[in-house]
Amino acid sequence: MNQENTQIVAAFYKFVSLPDFAEKQEPLLAYCLAQNIKGTILLAKEGINGTIAGSRLSIDNVLSYLRSDLRLQDLEHKESTADTPPFERMKVRLKKEIVTLGLPEVDPNEQVGAYVTPEEWNELISDPEVIVIDTRNDYEVHIGTFQGAQNPQTNSFRDFPEYVRQNLDPNQHKKVAMFCTGGIRCEKASSFMLSQGFAEVYHLKGGILKYLEQIPPEESLWQGECFVFDERIAVVHGLEPGTHELCFCCGHPLAEEDKASLQYEEGISCPHCFDSLTEDKRMRQQEKWRQYQLKNSHSLGNSKLGVAD
């Protein structure tokens, strides 16, 4: 990796009351643009959620700018690197929620489960009395998860409450441990679980990314790669880039075996979308792929890239 061109990728979030969040949008965007930062930051009444990339100095400046607000002075972030810019532009968006559960009454600023550090995580999820739940979407779980974790098979985080109502019982499932990419979804999920009467609710502090950063492979209970919402697509231990790519048609992460399938055609289809392609859709996709190649873009422009939502 060329150290001079190395991009620092910083991911952060914090649940904190920000009643003036809309007023922060334009100044924050202007500051990020002045620092040549790219990525996405979400602002809502319940807090902030973002992933940004840029030079070492620019990232440090933006994080200092954010922490100059006393409500964000203890804002934690996770870092990784990329050898090319992982985002095309800078966006600061106003949202109802910084991660969309669809239940405004669930407020992590009021109550959350117990934080578990990466060093404590293995012991917790090895307890046979603990049910371990991956709160991410099915396409993320598909490429990697923790040993023994339950996959709710959700298409979006909004589906998680229904999964809980249909499959979990506070009287039967006494201890619940949850995890997600960076910690934000499992933190909000823990608040929801407590509101549903679950007594012992735990969540992985810093998420999978912090675990992969701190826990050596020989001690790890993680299996596979971790999907990330930028053009690296996936990372492994040490937060090094993984091997997955995105299907240009449906956006599903693809492993090498997916690309070896007879149902895979670059830019057109993969095993996850092949059966849903009518002849008309295939023709439109072929034209879309042709136009993409003509533009010689360096970005997939896929809707899955940005921040976890």
UniProtKB/Swiss-Prot annotation:
Transmembrane segments: none annotated. Its EC number is 1.14.-.-. The active site is at C180 (cysteine persulfide intermediate). Keywords: Oxidoreductase, tRNA processing. PANTHER family: RHODANESE-LIKE DOMAIN-CONTAINING PROTEIN 7-RELATED, THIOSULFATE SULFURTRANSFERASE/RHODANESE-LIKE DOMAIN-CONTAINING PROTEIN 2. Belongs to the TrhO family. This is tRNA uridine(34) hydroxylase. The gene is trhO.
